Amino acid sequence: SFAGKYELQSQENFEAFMKAIGLPDELIQKGKDIKSVSEIQQNGKSFKVTVTTGSKVLENEFTLGEEAELETLTGEKVKSIVKQEGDNKLVVNLKGITSVTELSGDTLINTLQKGDDTYKRISKRI
């Protein structure tokens, strides 16, 4: 189960990736050192994911395999389908960005890819 709270431990390529997806420099500078906390609630195939970064809260609810409206890092709402691969991987495509969330023990690894740009977030269960 993905359920739990996870605190960001490290991230790779944050600034370059955020620039590539069009986030303004001011927001990139504000966000680069903030430790975000992700909370995942899971009930069978239904998920609620809340990511709190400072005062910004990003909340998405979805059911695996069904279309849902998801909010992206840039605040846009995009209709997409989250799929599960194996026991420990969630995959979704949001407007050209592929997001893979993988659970390995108490470590949650989220990799976002757009073209040649990749951004990786590593969080630990708290």
Curated annotation (Swiss-Prot):
Signal peptide limits: none
Free-text comment about domains: Forms a beta-barrel structure that accommodates hydrophobic ligands in its interior.
Organism per entry: Ambystoma mexicanum (Axolotl)
Subcellular location: Cytoplasm
Keywords annotated in UniProt: Cytoplasm, Lipid-binding, Transport
Function noted in UniProt: Binds free fatty acids and their coenzyme A derivatives, bilirubin, and some other small molecules in the cytoplasm. May be involved in intracellular lipid transport. The specificity of axolotl L-FABP differs from that of LB-FABP.
Entry's Gene Ontology cellular component terms: cytoplasm
Source species, domain of life: Eukaryota
GO terms assigned for molecular function: lipid binding
Family indicated by similarity: Belongs to the calycin superfamily. Fatty-acid binding protein (FABP) family.
CDD domains: FABP1
PANTHER family named among the record's database cross-references: FATTY ACID BINDING PROTEIN (PTHR11955)
Pfam families listed in its UniProt record: Lipocalin_7 (PF14651)
Protein name (Swiss-Prot/TrEMBL): Fatty acid-binding protein 1, liver
